[in-house]
Design a protein with these regions (language model features):
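Long amphipathic alpha-helical coiled-coil/heptad-repeat bundle
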Residues: 1-233
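Intrinsic-disorder/low-complexity loop/linker signature
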Residues: 1, 10, 14-15, 21, ...
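Hydrophobic transmembrane signal anchors and adjacent membrane-proximal interface regions, especially
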Residues: 3, 16-22, 184, 311, ...
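Interfaces and regulatory segments of ATP-dependent nucleotide/adenylate/phosphodiester-chemistry enzymes
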Residues: 143-349, 477-589
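C-terminal amphipathic "assembly/sorting" segment characterized by alternating charged
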Residues: 52-133, 138-139, 145, 381, ...
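Residue-identity detector for glycine
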Residues: 6, 15, 26, 38-39, ...
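Polar low-complexity intrinsically disordered regions
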Residues: 1-20, 24, 243, 379-380, ...
Length: 589
């Protein structure tokens, strides 16, 4: 089975974001506040939520003509036509021009949500023009921030310079642009079920689990999900590209349902966290009126199913009496649960039989030190998994600065110097274990010849924000440097494949296909071939060279999606069979 040449399409597209000075050359921009002074706060929030309701791919409003139609009424028809001509002339030069961007829409919402309403003095025609100008000022603000990406990568070695430029330019907002909402919903629900079952059965989380139920006034986690999931489904079923309102049905449960939703809304004039929209992630609804709640951003609502649970739990845990608090909650959820529940469950699902496999816990029980989080050998392919559930600080994420990214990722995935000593993680853990494999020092599995097996080093991450072109390039660059030390030791490294970072959600989503149709080791082999550096290639110009390099930066999760799509083997997890028996257990009894 082979992929068609050029099939794997990179989600990061080369194009222009429409800025103020491009749309209005020669005009001095004013501030967002100045443009929208005298505008209706209610309308501004409504429009911001409307723009955030656009599809992140295949949107009809990707057509700028269609977009400008909804921005301007008949009075501003000439203005809109002139603007469209300017955009059209840019696109004829080969530049794809975009206007709407999640950074600008979210920033606009945050800015005006925390401001009090003021008297409306602008006419509708004035507001239409001024709103667009304010929005383009925010676009310009975003592209100005991207300059840091260029400045911080210009002196990197050749193999990293362009990949890291693209990574740094896109990483801060890629998770809010390049995603499949259906895939995220399914994987969030599956992981939420695992988390609740974990909390429910662990003695050390008993008090926290009960406090969570009390906070939401529900009897068990099943009732919580049955209250929360319909909020996400209302948005998933909305075929219109606009904001989604959730109307609480009138009846005897009206007050109770509103009380539940009131715990998920951002409050008027609330102090909003300035980095990565953390407050809106935590509270992705706002109240329009009694019984009517508006979704601010669809993605943030879906991520509340599981990803946002940790922040709920942390806040509730912090408010418990100190003696009842779960100690090291972050480690419990981010390390123990992510590895020994999510990772173990996923590997056991996609490799049910016909292979040799050991969990990290089983390796320890065999008295073997220095083992990986999971070991799988299928025929002549060895897969070595290290699980790393982490988020970097929000201000670092939004920095566009390679030096900050390198520092944060190095600590999480390579090594960290503490008290003059190196603490090895990720890459270094994999290198140490590969040394064991190549010297036949892993006693749990020795029935192979080291020259006959291919070794696939894998770092599993637990968030889709790392599905960014260039991320894997950096981590594999570190890995290849360390692999040279094994080669210098005289070890046979020719069949050690490039390191691959994999978002575990992609394995959860494709669990059926990986189990029944194409095993992970075969897809990893295809991916290794795809990203392989090829020398002596000739390009017509620099743009063609950059397009080629960019195509090799694709995240494994994107590659996996396209691979199954190309083979016609995409099969969603049986979500009803996985969730319904426990979610509706009371009704079945």
């Amino acid at each position: 089975m082979q992929l068609s040449k050029g099939l794997i399409d990179n989600p990061i597209k080369m194009g222009l974001l429409l800025e103020f000075n491009i749309a209005f050359p020669g005009e001095e921009p004013r501030t967002v506040e100045e443009y929208l002074k005298g505008g209706s706060r209610e309308i501004i929030l409504n429009v911001a939520a409307f723009l955030l309701g656009f599809k992140n791919h295949d949107s009809k409003y990707a057509d700028n003509k269609e977009l400008l139609k909804i921005f301007f009424g008949p009075t501003n028809n000439d203005f809109a036509n002139e603007l469209f001509k300017r955009i059209n002339s840019l696109e004829k030069e080969g530049n794809r021009v975009g206007i709407i961007h999640p950074y600008s829409s979210l920033t606009l919402f945050e800015y005006f949500f925390k401001r009090p309403a003021e008297a409306q003095t602008q006419t509708d025609a004035e507001f239409e023009v001024n709103f667009l100008k304010a929005y383009l000022v925010l676009n310009s603000e975003y592209t100005a921030k991207q300059q840091k990406a260029s400045d911080s990568t210009k002196d990197l070695v050749r193999d990293l310079a362009f990949p890291m430029l693209m990574f740094c330019m896109n990483y801060p907002v890629s998770d809010k642009q390049h995603y499949d909402i259906n895939e995220i919903w399914i994987t969030q629900v599956i992981k939420a079920k695992l988390l609740f079952e974990f909390l429910e059965t662990q003695e050390r989380t008993a008090v926290l689990y009960k406090a969570f139920l009390d906070f939401f006034e529900v009897k068990d986690w099943q009732e919580y999900l049955k209250s929360f999931l319909p909020l996400t489904l209302s948005m998933m079923k909305n075929e219109n590209e606009s904001h989604t309102d959730f109307h609480v049905p009138e009846g005897e449960s009206f007050e109770r349902a509103c009380a539940f939703l009131d715990k998920l809304i951002v409050e008027d004039q609330e102090d909003l966290n300035e980095y990565d929209f953390l407050t809106l992630r935590s509270k992705p609804f706002y109240k329009v009126k009694d019984g009517v709640y508006r979704i601010i951003f669809n993605l943030f609502v879906v991520e509340k199913i599981f990803k946002g649970m940790y922040f709920f739990l942390r806040e509730i845990n912090d408010n418990l009496p100190e003696a009842q608090q779960v100690k090291a909650l972050k480690s419990l959820v981010g390390d123990f649960f992510s590895e020994q529940v999510v990772l173990y469950d996923t590997i056991q699902t996609i490799f049910p039989d016909k292979c040799i496999k050991f969990s990290g816990q089983e390796i320890v029980q065999k008295g073997i030190s220095g083992g990986p989080d999971y070991y799988v050998r299928k025929n002549h392919d060895i897969m070595v998994f290290e699980s790393k559930d982490f988020l970097i600080p929000a201000d670092a994420k939004m920095s566009f600065d390679f030096a900050r990214y390198e520092d944060e990722f190095e600590k999480k995935l390579y090594f960290e110097v503490r008290d003059g000593k190196e603490k090895h993680v990720g890459v270094m853990q994999l290198i140490a274990f590969i040394r064991k494999l190549l010297t036949k020092d892993f006693s749990a599995d020795t029935n192979y010849h080291y020259r006959d097996v291919s070794i696939f080093p894998i770092i599993l991450v637990h968030d889709h924000q790392y599905n960014v072109p260039g991320f894997n390039t950096l981590i594999n660059y570190w890995f290849q440097a360390e692999l040279e030390t094994l080669k210098e030791e005289g070890l046979y490294t020719a069949k050690v494949k490039p390191l691959v970072t994999i978002n575990i959600d992609s394995l959860i989503y494709h669990q059926v296909g990986l189990r029944d149709s194409i095993p992970l080791n075969l897809v990893l082999g295809k991916f290794a071939e795809h990203i392989k550096k090829r020398t002596h290639l000739k390009f017509r110009d620099e743009d063609e060279m950059k397009a080629y390099v960019l195509s090799r930066q694709v995240a494994f999760s994107t590659f996996l999606n396209e691979y199954f799509k190309d083979q016609g083997l995409t099969k969603k997890p049986p979500i009803v069979e996985l969730i319904a028996p426990t979610l509706f257990k009371d009704e079945q009894q």
